[in-house]
Amino acid sequence: MSATGQSKRLAVPDIAARKGREPVAVLTAYTVSMARLLDPHVEVLLVGDSLGMVLYGFDSTLPVTLDMMIAHGAAVVRGSSRACVVVDMPWASYQEGREQAFRNAARILAETGCAAVKLEGGEEMAETVDFLVRRGIPVMGHVGLTPQAVNALGGYRARGRSDAEQAKILGDARAVAEAGAFALVVEGVVEPLARAVTEAVPCVTIGIGASAACDGQVLVSDDLLGLYGAFTPKFVRRYAELGPVIEEAAATYAADVRARRFPGTEHVFAARKAS
């Protein structure tokens, strides 16, 4: 604790040091209000490009822009004081080359105040990861089911069911880790492969639809809270069902308005009495 009584914000080295220790809890956040609610309870707040589907109604993450990620990343940093904030690099903001990746990653860090960026890809992105890390930009990698490559992968299906696919993903994980990533999201792979990746790489692994053996876990908060109804992946556990609660509150409010029960006298300002 600091002299002011506030806990210090967790930094990239704090997360990296959790390898093989107490698992790291990660949740997504896109707004100030959600960041404030989640911040005391998790080690990492991930501003994921999943916001494109959850907040904007896109059918994939591909339409998400750099400006969107920066706006939401800055909001989450402002709304938090403890968690390490990581911001996704959106599709086409880093794949062109390492110089493009550096320019956009540097802009994300400078304009949001976040601690690190996350990018998807395996061996083909190792050079870019190395380029960023050597220039002071911490990187969280992402292998396995990579949503930005959904068109090339042929949809959202579990990866690593064949020997060839397992070897490819394991090689991707090693390449990104050796390039200097401090953490690695392992998404949508068969459980034994996620366990093997965790054992093979020196960096923290964060599982999502992977394995309890990973060094941490991440979920999309709207999935966890029952707020995203488009579909529920197999790997999601709903810890609350807030959708019906919100619907009931809205319906009750609307009924009170129509019946003139709201606002009541306690919600309006009385005129001052003349002195």
From Swiss-Prot:
Cofactor detail note? Binds 1 Mg(2+) ion per subunit.
Entry's localization field? Cytoplasm
The reaction(s) catalysed by this protein are: 3-methyl-2-oxobutanoate + (6R)-5,10-methylene-5,6,7,8-tetrahydrofolate + H2O = 2-dehydropantoate + (6S)-5,6,7,8-tetrahydrofolate
Instruction: Fetch the InterPro entries from UniProt.
Output: Pantoate_hydroxy_MeTrfase, Pyrv/PenolPyrv_kinase-like_dom, Pyrv_kinase-like_dom_sf
Going by the UniProt record, its keywords in alphabetical order are: Cytoplasm, Magnesium, Metal-binding, Pantothenate biosynthesis, Transferase
Q: Name one GO biological process term.
A: pantothenate biosynthetic process
The biological pathway it contributes to is: Cofactor biosynthesis; (R)-pantothenate biosynthesis; (R)-pantoate from 3-methyl-2-oxobutanoate: step 1/2
Q: Which cofactors does this protein require?
A: Mg(2+)
Superkingdom is Bacteria
The residues annotated as the active site are: 187 (proton acceptor)
**Residues that bind Mg(2+), according to the entry?**
49, 88, 120
State the protein's purpose: Catalyzes the reversible reaction in which hydroxymethyl group from 5,10-methylenetetrahydrofolate is transferred onto alpha-ketoisovalerate to form ketopantoate.
What's the protein here called?
A: 3-methyl-2-oxobutanoate hydroxymethyltransferase
Q: Lineage, please?
A: Bacteria, Pseudomonadati, Pseudomonadota, Alphaproteobacteria, Rhodospirillales
Q: Which gene encodes it?
A: panB
